[in-house]
């Protein structure tokens, strides 16, 4: 089997994890205590979910996941919540003191004490797999545990499991909505550390998802639960073909092969459609062409940036539900003819398709309407560089005054690491700029040198 281990780091990682496992259980017919639901036991078993769940001797299903946070509050809610019997208690790992929004605490001081214990648990879960495919790491860029411990974990995973895929789902600091003052520091330090260790990083930003909840789903004041359930649908779409059968399956390695033209440029933009509330669902057709076009609307993106300002390098369209391949091909060819969507000239084909026959799962009392088909688009576009330059600008404003730096240095970090990280991100912005240039322009520039 091709198993995948999910690792949820910090508060954001844990809460997104809760939403994801709730959804996986509904999709596979697994009760909150880990047993199969009665209607599922009569049907022949689909083998697919053993990629995400392991079966115990007594016929219980246990998620192949590890939750880790440096302070206990958030994971305690999992230990006492609805799904407390689903998870293996030793795979919920908490420390005693939190990282206090400080990358250095998560990475150097507090995180160091916990990392070996966490790796030991991951090793046990990995030993239980017959053909481990890779890891999904969920964390935020802004928090101390998510940025610091998340980076430390990815570094150590590269050492222990060099060839396995490591995909990140990262909550990126939103342009307007901020949860901590030092987000720009944490984000740039963690990106610098993980740039060479992570194979592919799907970014979501809270503000973009707030806007989707308000605009498309008519939720006046979205809470984290609304946001996380939306993210869970996206994660489920990305992992659906690992868990269900379809005519075009996509595994973890295929994402990298098709989406990452150069190792550093591994931050695809995520878009999902249809995003409609139950009230509007009856008036929408949701044809394949409609939902495919909706993916190219900036309003449906999970990160605030405008793809019309950049060029697409590669695009991966993952359909699920009632899909006929012929419709998909028509929709894609009509998009190719549109002049508004620009591809870089060195990547003429640009589309990777995945089709999975399992329709999107409706979550009871959820925000999204029940639909019979959906699509998730992962696109590597040069416009995501906007997100980096926004962040770099905020970093520069604070760092020019050396504001808050003493908190990091006090935890054993060198001040030089700040400037090193900032230079690395400047290089990343430059990489995006160069990739977007036409190949003829590039040749002329090389000749000038």
UniProtKB/Swiss-Prot annotation:
Its EC number is 3.6.5.-. It is an enzyme of class 3 (hydrolase). It is found in: Cytoplasm, Cytoskeleton. One of its GO terms (cellular component) is microtubule. Its cofactor is Mg(2+). InterPro entries: Alpha_tubulin, Tub_FtsZ_C, Tubulin, Tubulin/FtsZ-like_C, Tubulin/FtsZ_2-layer-sand-dom, Tubulin/FtsZ_GTPase_sf, Tubulin_C, Tubulin_CS. PROSITE patterns: TUBULIN. GO terms for molecular function: GTP binding; hydrolase activity; metal ion binding; structural constituent of cytoskeleton. It holds the Pfam family Tubulin. Keywords: Cytoplasm, Cytoskeleton, GTP-binding, Hydrolase, Magnesium, Metal-binding, Microtubule, Nucleotide-binding. GTP binds at residues 11, 71, 140, 144-145, 179, 206, 228. Transmembrane segments: none annotated. It comes from the Eukaryota. SUPFAM superfamilies: Tubulin C-terminal domain-like, Tubulin nucleotide-binding domain-like. The record marks 449 as: Involved in polymerization. Mg(2+) binds at residue 71. The active site is at residue 254. GO terms for biological process: microtubule-based process. It catalyses: GTP + H2O = GDP + phosphate + H(+). Dimer of alpha and beta chains. A typical microtubule is a hollow water-filled tube with an outer diameter of 25 nm and an inner diameter of 15 nM. Alpha-beta heterodimers associate head-to-tail to form protofilaments running lengthwise along the microtubule wall with the beta-tubulin subunit facing the microtubule plus end conferring a structural polarity. Microtubules usually have 13 protofilaments but different protofilament numbers can be found in some organisms and specialized cells. Tubulin is the major constituent of microtubules, a cylinder consisting of laterally associated linear protofilaments composed of alpha- and beta-tubulin heterodimers. Microtubules grow by the addition of GTP-tubulin dimers to the microtubule end, where a stabilizing cap forms. Below the cap, tubulin dimers are in GDP-bound state, owing to GTPase activity of alpha-tubulin. Belongs to the tubulin family. This is Tubulin alpha chain. It comes from Pneumocystis carinii. The lineage of its organism: Eukaryota, Fungi, Dikarya, Ascomycota, Taphrinomycotina. The gene is TUB1.
């Amino acid at each position: 089997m091709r198993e995948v281990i999910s690792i949820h780091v910090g508060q954001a990682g844990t809460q997104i994890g809760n939403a994801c496992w709730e959804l996986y259980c509904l999709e596979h017919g697994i009760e909150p205590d880990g047993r199969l639901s009665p209607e599922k036991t009569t049907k022949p078993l689909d083998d697919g979910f053993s990629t995400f769940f392991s079966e115990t001797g007594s016929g219980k299903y246990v998620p192949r996941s590890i939750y880790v946070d440096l302070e206990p509050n958030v994971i305690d809610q999992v230990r006492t919540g609805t799904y407390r019997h689903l998870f293996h208690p030793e795979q919920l790992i908490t420390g005693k003191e939190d990282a206090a929004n400080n990358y250095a605490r998560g990475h150097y001081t507090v995180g160091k004490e916990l990392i070996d214990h966490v790796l030991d648990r991951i090793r046990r879960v990995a030993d239980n797999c017959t053909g481990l495919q890779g890891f999904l790491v969920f964390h935020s860029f802004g928090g101390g545990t998510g940025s610091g411990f998340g980076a430390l974990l990815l570094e150590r995973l590269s050492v222990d499991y060099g060839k396995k895929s490591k995909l990140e789902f990262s909550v990126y600091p939103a342009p307007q909505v901020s949860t901590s003052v030092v987000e720009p520091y944490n984000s740039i330090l963690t990106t610098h550390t993980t740039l060479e260790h992570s194979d592919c990083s799907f970014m979501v930003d809270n503000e973009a998802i707030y806007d989707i909840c308000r605009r498309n789903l008519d939720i006046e004041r979205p809470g984290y639960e609304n946001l996380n359930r939306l993210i869970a649908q996206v994660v489920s779409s990305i992992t659906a073909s690992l868990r269900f059968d379809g005519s075009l399956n996509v595994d973890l390695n295929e994402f990298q092969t098709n989406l990452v033209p150069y190792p550093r440029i591994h931050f695809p933009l995520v878009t999902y459609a249809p995003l409609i509330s139950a009230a509007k669902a009856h008036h929408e057709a949701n044809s394949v062409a409609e939902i495919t076009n909706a993916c190219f609307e900036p309003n449906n993106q999970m990160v605030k940036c405008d793809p019309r300002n950049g060029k697409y390098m590669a695009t991966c369209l993952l359909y699920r539900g009632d899909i006929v391949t012929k419709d998909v091909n028509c929709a894609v060819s009509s998009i190719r003819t549109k002049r508004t969507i620009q591809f870089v000239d060195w990547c003429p084909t640009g589309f990777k398709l995945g089709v999975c026959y399992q329709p999107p799962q409706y979550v009871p009392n959820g925000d999204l309407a029940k639909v019979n088909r959906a699509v998730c688009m992962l696109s590597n576009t040069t416009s995501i560089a906007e997100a980096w330059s926004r962040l770099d600008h905020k970093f520069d404003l604070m760092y020019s005054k050396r504001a808050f730096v003493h908190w990091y240095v006090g935890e054993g970090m060198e001040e030089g690491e700040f400037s090193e990280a900032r230079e690395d991100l400047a290089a990343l912005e430059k990489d995006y700029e160069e990739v977007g240039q036409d190949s003829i322009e590039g040749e002329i520039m090389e000749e000038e040198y």
